[in-house]
Structures are given as C-alpha cells and as structure tokens.
Amino acid sequence: MKNFDFIIVGGGTSGTITSEKLIRNGYKVLIIEEGKKNNNPLLSMPAGWIPMLDGSPYLKFYKSIPQPQLNNRQHDIAQAKVLGGGSSVNGMVYMRGKPSDYNRWAEATGDERWGWNSLINNYKALENNQRLAGETHGTDGPIKVSDPGYVAEGSNLYIKTMQKLGLPYNRDFNDGNQYGVGLMQYTIGDGKRCDTVSALINPLLNDKNLEIMLNTVVIKLIIENKKAIGVETISNGKYEKIYGKEIILTAGALITPKI
C-alpha cells in the first residue's frame, strides 16, 4: 500500500509549484494528474500553443450553463489536461493580479499573508526577469520572464493611439499599477516556454521523494473520522486507493469543487 506525506491532486501550475516546495523541504509527495507529460515539442514553442487549441489532447472542454447576460448562450470553457496545467498550454502572458484583489483575500481570511505586501515576496522568489528588477521583481528565480521578441506593427499603432487618447504608457504592469497601455511580458526564456514543469519539476525527477502518476483520475476522497486520509483513483480501468497524511486539491476551479 502506497503512503505519502502529501498527495497533490492535479499536476497543474499550482500543484507543481506546491509539490516542488514540499519536496525541497524533505516531504514525500505524489502528484496525480489526469493528463499526459508535457513533452510535445509544440508545447515548448512560443507559437506552438495556437495549433493546440483545436482538438488538443492537452485540453479538456466543458460547457457552461446558459448565461442570462449573454442571451442565454452557452460557452466552451477550456481546462488544461497535461502536467504543468495552464503553464504548459496558455498564451504565456505574465500578468499578476491587482494588489486590491489580494488585499481583499487577506481581509476575507483575516490573514495578512494573503495580501499584496506578503505575496509579492513569493512572486519575486519565483521570477527570473530579464529586464525588470527592484522592489517588485526577482532576477534569480526559476520562472523566466521576458519582453516579447517580436512586436507587430498593429500593436505599436494601438499603443500610440491609446496614448493620443490620454492613456499613459506603462512599462511594467506587474509593479502594482496596471493603469495605462504598453507591452506585456511573457514566461519565455531562451526562445522557449518556461512552464512550471521545466522550471520546477524536471530538476527533481530523480528525487526519491517525488512520484508522479499520469493519465490518472481521482474519483473520490477517502474520509475517515471526518478527515481525508487518501484518494481513490482510476487509470486504464484499474482502481487504486492511495493514502497520505495530507491531501491537497489543486485540480482547477472546475474539478476541485467536484471532487
């Protein structure tokens, strides 16, 4: 019977970041991911994510309920189904949330660690920014962040037009002030996508404290005395029960509540 310190349900962006931190602190971690490895060359190419949008094995689509505000239309909602989650298939735009959003988290939880002044330290620790530095940016973290290598003329014209309409130029949308117009940065380094697998998990693949189960779905939590002590999974038609001291659900906004 397998037993772990932590079982991470969902090997997406938050799941892989959480796993890396736990493993570096000496804990035995199991990552359970419904999708595949993110080793398709197209995934690492900055322009390769576009062909992945249609019929991709790395995405799973859900249908929304009818939306009254949109004339009752239903919309497809894409969720990553691959190790690394959204960091493996997204458009690579590096954009933090607004400070006011994080401060509302701190207010709602009564925990200042969820506030902007605290979380900015986590962002800095993760970031390896190739242009920006200072109080709000990191330059030696694992996640590479860079300016766009090519800027379409239409983008330059748009920026000039918005400036003529009175919007200020913003050289950094991630320093706490997101007002204005400018160019965004991307999680790209050395011409390749910098996802959480290549940056955080691949360096730990030989670590005895890391185990990864791919193509595996968690169908329910195992509860004993009102505490989650494990998960029941299915993979290729085979059911398995796996136990851990703590279960962390990082299966995305749609699947985490479902579990």
What does each model-found stretch correspond to?
Residues 1-124:
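N-terminal glycine-rich phosphate/pyrophosphate-binding loop and immediately adjacent elements
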Residues 2-4, 237-246, 250:
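Core beta-strand elements of the Rossmann-like FAD/NAD(P) dinucleotide-binding domain
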Residues 12-13, 34-37, 217, 244-246, ...:
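Glycine-/small-residue-rich beta->alpha transition segments that form the dinucleotide
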Residues 106-110, 253-259:
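Alpha-helical support elements that line or immediately flank enzyme active sites
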Residues 108-224, 228:
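Conserved redox-cofactor binding core of oxidoreductases
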Residues 230-234:
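Short beta-strand segments that buttress and anchor functional surface loops
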